[in-house]
Amino acid sequence: FYMDRILAREGVCSGNAGSNGNADGNTFLTRGRALYMYTSSPSVIGFGGNTAYHQPLGRGDLVRVLFSNADGSLTTKEDTSKRVNAPSNWSSTYSVGSNLTLDVVKFIHQENVAVTTMTLTNKSAEDQAITVAADSIFATEPGKVTVNGAEQTELTGTCSSPAGLTTIYARMTGDGFEAASSDDYCWLSRDVTVPAGGSVELKVVIAFTTEEIPESTEQYLRFAGLGNLEAVRAQKAEYNLYWAENLPYIDVPKKAVQKAIDYRWWLERFNSLDANIPGYDYQSPVTIEGVLGYNNAIILTQPMHLQDTKWLRSPYLAYGQLLSAGNSSQSSAFLDNPGNRNNWNNHYGQYLAEAGYEAFNVIGGGAELAENLAYYFGHDATGQLEHYGNHIEGRDLIAYRNNYMTGNDADTISMHAPGTGTWKAHGENAYVWAAADAAAKLYEQLGNTEQAKYYRDLADKIKADVLELMWCEECQKFETYAVRPTGTQHNANQPNLVKYTESNNYNYFAVGLVPDDAASVTKYKEALKAFSNGKEFPIFPFYTANQVHNQEVSGSNPLISTRRACSSAG
């Protein structure tokens, strides 16, 4: 399978995850729609690490498999040279004691079912009697389950997902395993005799089921009833079928560039969540800014993901993003998804309406969808103005007091230039215009002339204010507008303008706000000369701040590329 082949990581991979994830770069690559491993511990046979269901649960391993004989516990050690970490499955080989080897292939199915298949081989000349134990902190209550018409032992458990968004019902079973217990703690146990020179197959299946995803129960029972080879083949085929059905064909001559594209597609799938949780958070599929880091559907980066996901043949993720953001924002400016309440839940500067309108043009849809999107886009524009638009009297412009609202944090050097005061109108006004413009266009297509006129008039007002207040005639570029500066910045005729610029000051070009008649092109194209000399905005690496200006007012992270220009899935 192509994606497995091109993206597989062999052996121990290098990488520095900073404060999150795995320092060795060996994050488990397969995941379910909501169940995944926030960290991975390959030394644990099964699924070791910090188990996550839409967010880390902080309760440790999902499942452990241990071995013992009459003399006591058997030590296991991975042969890391045999490790292959592929998008659909993870495989490796372990030594068990002194004369046994264990081949492991494990995966997490789309429907939140984690399967560990094992082949235990005896290298000695004598039969070996072994006890295999499998335990999970999430499933400790013994019971029975019917698999392929026959009863077998099952362990179950219940817990709440982070922030109490849903209830998880864990279910675990294994081929030939029975319940064992000690001090009120229960696990699965199986005694096996591995013949001299022979092998024994083992399998443990655990699922996180919920009321809102009945498919998890169906797939749990299905994989519990499959043989090892059947289970692995089914996972590989079904996981990779997604790519065959969804990816547009792109032929890139340079293999390194092609791999980067493939990896980006994989990132969009890995950094997504389809938990189907009722309410105003994860009720629709969403993309996440780094499931191993921020782990939030932060509104700032939703349009960046959408620029990718709109090209998938299935609209489930692209439209899931839009419907989730629109519904969660409740008739106001687009808001961070509230599902992760440890994060900011703010109305950041973002261009989701512009990207959403582009997605609608690519994917298509009916009048009902267009009506919803127009409503969301329009209320994002008016909501932004309600939240941040009361600082410049008589103008339809938003202003921020904090540099992180732009997404570039301290590298928004114009926001902390000396003498600029507290509030600044910045390049995110382009996105407010784009939201009003997108709403107007959709209402025009729907034939709703009243709403179309309302948002067209609003877009025109924003455009007029931007062109009048934020264009520096002296410097021939768009600049940040200090609402109440403590002194003239650099232009006596336009004393509110700040000369220091970032890539965000060019948002007006990106969204199409800048007029394109002949006279306007002649005038405004002068601003683009900053990209021509390689000193202000180098091609690579691409910096957030104008690097000439950054020498005068340094940002904290000059090497961080702007999210708008070089978006990442996390």
For the regions a language model picked out, list residue spans one by one.
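Substrate-binding groove/exosite segments of carbohydrate-active enzymes
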Residues: 232-371, 378, 495-511, 544
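Terminal accessory carbohydrate-recognition/targeting modules of carbohydrate-active enzymes
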Residues: 1-255, 569
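Glycine- and aromatic-rich loop/turn segments at beta-sheet edges
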Residues: 274-291, 320, 326-342, 383-418, ...
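Amphipathic, well-ordered alpha-helical segments in soluble domains
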Residues: 58-61, 68, 87-89, 317, ...
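Catalytic cores of carbohydrate-active enzymes
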Residues: 241, 258-263, 385-399, 421-425, ...
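C-terminal capping/lid segments that line or modulate ligand- or cofactor-binding pockets
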Residues: 1-58, 294-297, 352-353, 359-365, ...
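Short, positively charged low-complexity motifs
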Residues: 555, 568-569
